[in-house]
Amino acid sequence: SVFPSDDVTRAFLAAEGREEDFIPLESDPDAQYDRVIDIDLGTLRPMIACPHSPDNVVPVETLAGTRVDQVCIGSCTNSSLFDMLKVAALLKGRTIAPGVSLSISPGSKQVLTMLADCGALTDILSSGARLLECACGPCIGMGFSPNSGGVSLRTFNRNFLGRSGTKDAQVY
């Protein structure tokens, strides 16, 4: 199967200085498949993994009003430049709520450099967010662990019991 390349693909390559590598890809109009699965992405609901398993998911709106002590954004799996620019736009001109700590973990030096070059890193840091190294860290309980009994909202790909470095934390 082929997911067609589009303007988003071209923009990514341009940001990487590789726009000349863009190749339009799409399936042949007469291609035959054993099975076709069409997913209307507009019908998907945002989901969140509840403690203590990535498989323990519920619609995110069911957790509205949940107290959060800590937010960790980034990691090696969820910190593309596109995602980090969204974070910067949301934080621009705002400050982190009292009682909440926020960390940002760009997944690579390249993403960090691009954030700095375009000014987005300033917006993130001006909000009161803490910048962490481009490395394993809070995901494996190495720094920025939540408080005992705390609630941590993370964009990381794992939320197993104790993995955050705090056994009694509720990690989403």
Task: Please place each PLM-identified region on the residue numbering.
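Fe-S-dependent hydro-lyases/dehydratases of central metabolism
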Residues: 1-172
